[in-house]
Amino acid sequence: MDKVQSGFLILFLFLMECQLHLCLPYADGLHPTGNITGLPGSKRSQPPRNITKEPKVFFHKTQLPGIQGAASRSTAASPTNPMKFLRNKAIIRHRPALVKVILISSVAFSIALICGMAISYMIYRLAQAEERQQLESLYKNLRIPLLGDEEEGSEDEGESTHLLPENENELEKFIHSVIISKRSKNIKKKLKEEQNSVTENKTKNASHNGKMEDL
């Protein structure tokens, strides 16, 4: 019974650890620094814009449109910090639907484990109560002859004769202990009776001798 309970406890702790690992979106200690796209329900987080006042210039900036587009593409393609880019690639993406399914299944499985443990404990207690009843009935129906007396009568067939084979060793030990205790009680009773008879004889002899001396 203790082994079964320890196994259930280890399994329950393992499931809870897996559940927490899956529920955390960034289990490796990495945090997002940029925009994560392609996820359901995820919104693009725009970085704060630093608004700086440019000085007024009294001449117009003249740039060609082709050069301006190429420059904007190069700045968009090359990340400002390569370590941030690698971290964004290594992030474990969060899946809320999968996490909910795993959470519900783990909770249901843990409830089923608890119910199974309770049922097994109830069955174990009922089996122990039945064994105690069988032992009590066996103790009541057990007949042990006194030392030196002959066995009389036939053995009665009752509930004590129909026992489970699993409990034979325990019943044998119990029967041996009962036999030893009853024999010791019988021996003590006989010794007390002998001592009482000896003391009675001594008192009778003493009284008889006193009467003879008086005569």
From Swiss-Prot:
Q: Spell out where the chain crosses the membrane.
A: 101-121
Q: Which residues lie on this side of the membrane: Extracellular?
A: 30-100
Instruction: Give the superkingdom in one word.
Output: Eukaryota
The question of whether Methyltransferase is a record keyword is answered with no
Q: Where in the cell is it found?
A: Membrane
The residues forming the signal peptide are: 1-29
Residue ranges of the region described as Disordered = 191-215
Q: Where is this chain compositionally biased, Polar residues type?
A: 196-208
Which parts of the chain does the record assign to the membrane side Cytoplasmic? 122-215
This protein's major location comes to membrane
Do the record's keywords include Transmembrane helix?
yes
Query: What are the record keywords, sorted?
Result: Membrane, Signal, Transmembrane, Transmembrane helix
Q: Which residues form a coiled coil?
A: none
Name of the protein:
Uncharacterized protein C19orf18
Q: In which organism is this protein found? A: Homo sapiens (Human)
